[in-house]
From Swiss-Prot:
Entry's Gene Ontology BP terms: cell division; DNA damage response; G2/M transition of mitotic cell cycle; intracellular signal transduction; mitotic cell cycle; protein autophosphorylation
Phosphoserine: residues carrying this PTM: 363, 465, 654, 677
Acidic residues bias (residue ranges): 608-617
Protein kinase domain boundaries: 32-843
Keyword Transferase: yes
UniProt region (Disordered), positions on chain: 321-353, 410-435, 556-624
Origin superkingdom: Eukaryota
Enzyme Commission number: 2.7.11.1
Family: Belongs to the protein kinase superfamily. AGC Ser/Thr protein kinase family.
GO CC terms, sorted: centrosome; cleavage furrow; cytoplasm; nucleoplasm; nucleus
Catalytic residue list: 155
Protein name in UniProt: Serine/threonine-protein kinase greatwall
Naturally occurring in which organism (per UniProt): Xenopus laevis (African clawed frog)
AGC-kinase C-terminal domain ranges (all copies): 844-887
Amino acid sequence: MGIVAETSQNGDTSLCSEKKFTVPQPPSIEEFGIVKPISRGAFGKVYLARRKNNSKLFAVKVVKKADMINKNMVQQVQAERDALALSKSPFIVHLYYSLQSANNIYLVMEYLIGGDVKSLLHIYGYFDEEMAVKYISEVAMALDYLHRHGIIHRDLKPDNMLISNKGHIKLTDFGLSKVTLKRELCMMDILTTPSMAKPKRDYSRTPGQVLSLISSLGFNTPAGGRTQGSLNQQTEGMRGNASTPLLMKKRESLVKGNKLMISCPEASLSSPSIPVKCLTPNLLKCRTQFATSSTSSQSRICLSSLESECGSPRWENCSQDAEAPPYFNSSRVKDSSSEQARSKKPTGSSASQNLKRLEFAFSPIVDRRTGKKAGFQDETGELSDTPLATLNAKGVIRKCLYENKAQEKPKDFDKTGQGELGKFTSSPDSPPWLANGSVAPIQFNDEEKTEKMGVKRNYDLVEKSPEQELLQDKKTNTDYKRGCAITDYPVSQSTGLTMEINSLFLSELRNSANKYASDRKSEDKYISAPRTLEKLDSGNPVAKNLLCELDDNCERDGEVSSTSEGEDRKERLNQDSSSTGMSVTENQIDRDLSHVDKSIKELSFEESQSENSEEITPDNKGIPFMAENDERVQSKYEPNTSILPDSLQNVLASPAPASAMTNPRRKPMVAFRSYNSPINVSNVSEPSKISMNSADKIHFSLECTGSFPMAVTPAQNKVQGLIETPYRTPKSVRRGGIQVDHERILGTPDYLAPELLLRKSHGPAVDWWALGVCLFEFLTGIPPFNDETPSQVFQNILNRDIPWPEEEEEVLSVNAQSAIEILLTIDPTKRAGLKDLKAHPLFHGMEWEELQYQPMSFIPQPDDETDTTYFEARNNAQHLKVSGFSL
């Protein structure tokens, strides 16, 4: 009964007590070979790769971990992998494997040979109505599938629509997507992934694929440094190994196995670990020097092809990759020791053995199929977080670096780096090769920064996240050293690329909004004179948003007593800000915010002390605090926006309480930091205790910030006697407003929805807005809000300025224009969805359940299976240069 029987030589039969099973394992990136690069996006590059065992073609998206850490995009990479892993739809690109190495993440997806719709649009100019309707229908089905499973794409555009070999559309590039799954993927999520009504074998996944898709993505890269909690433990472990034999013995007992001892004692006495990113050129030189990467053993002892090509600074020409981040374009310190030692060092067996050990320790993705421990794996079956997490790898790499230091000759830096060299060589903790002056001269470039190998960078050279860069004052173009000249405004093509929207772009919108309010001043008594901020393009965005939104709400918040008082208010504001550096608005806050009992300044720390506080019961403690669901409160706080144009009524209208909320008590002077002073964005707090009676006041406070708190805890009924000064502004509130989840605006300017620009809470409606933009672009050839600069694009979006074609041969049909109108609705609650599109006359006669089988207008005709010419039109139009390499 399931027991294997074996027959011996004498014919007797015996029962075998063991049965061997093949344990499924995810594949290694070594099993894929690069064919050619395909395209490049904002956060990664895509390559055409071939599986070595079955010659099947895949599209491999390579994302650098250090790049994602520097851009603060770690969570977005995780969201992209999860969104693709959870999706099984004929209109969404299929993800096969999710692999990773020490420096990169590899998403192995299906290869769609037809290219992207953006390239096809550049070739066609524009699509006819039938072709555009078919494409929009398939994309609408994909969006509906994603939204039903809690996924918002948030970067929908023709660039992210791929064409299959039969001409059908599939969505890709979920790098900015939002997944409601608040945990890591498990096997049940992959196995029970919702699919079509009749699942096909095309959507089934092998055990190796499932294991790779549920694996945790580790961003503890050697280049970026280990940032997780295991850093201290691993550091202590390495220090223990390098200190005394007693601690080394203790570590051996913990891992329950004997480790290879280091043959050179000087390696254990060296300085702390060196970043792997700087060791890659040395490794490549050593490979060339000793010629150990033969054809028979290349896949076993050498770096993987993808790892060496994508991780090495030598792989790409920096001049060809001008749009890459400065971190990867910076020049490296040349290792002259390897160049000098080529003619001096013998290529003996010991050197070759050391190189093998170095490469074996450096690459964590080799020797996956054998029973040996790859990447110095211990007997517990768990790989270390990084290849340098063990003492063996650390010692081997240092040994290779220190071997020839006695033969090196001191050389001087150029004048640009001479000061830095003296600073590090004079330190007692500096590495021996710096102490001996054995650093090769660097050919300094005035437009690049230099990163020293093995030396911790200064603060000025540390890569900063986008939020940290916004905290600094704006610099001029001459302050930045770039590989190419930059203009005052980006070119028109840049509005079609994915980017992070800075406050610099949004500040121009506020200026135009203030100008518009000034023009309407004489017509409406509820709008006061606009107040222009001092420096909208510098300082912290949180403080600017707080002040701008307070100004916008207060200007529509009631009748100003007199014009002279407003002018007097401005004079005092300018005097205080120029003398003390603080924007003190005493009378302004007194008059404009005197009606608000609890504004955003006290929301984090203070309670409303009302005599008739409502008792919290199990019946009412689940009531949401959003007063927009209450018709009584909504009618009470309805603002007067009838004087505004129809296109701006829904955008600029804010349900801020007007003069109906009266409070006879005057508030004290409130001080805000200056616009130019840096503010710590992370030093904010969530609301802790809010009474149930202040629901209406909470509503106004939340509208000031354009978001809602993550959690609101009602206050206890007992009176706390520690609150003696309920109107004191807490210190942390002066540093900015409540931190919201979606503070950054990421996306392509032409396709952003108005609620994203206004930093309001958003949902799946942002994808339907982008679909309306795509429909207009399909029929006309250009996006409806396209302009010269991103700020002008944003202004067109908020104004809903759509340039409808007027000529006879280019005019859109009534049904097409109506479909665009219902998709490009400012109010996200009234925006059309799949149900509305199915009932629209433009899509009349469309067989929605059989879309994947309908004949398409365009069917790719490639020269061969590796033809990538359908991707070139978009790359050339957007000036994207895909780096080449030698196979």
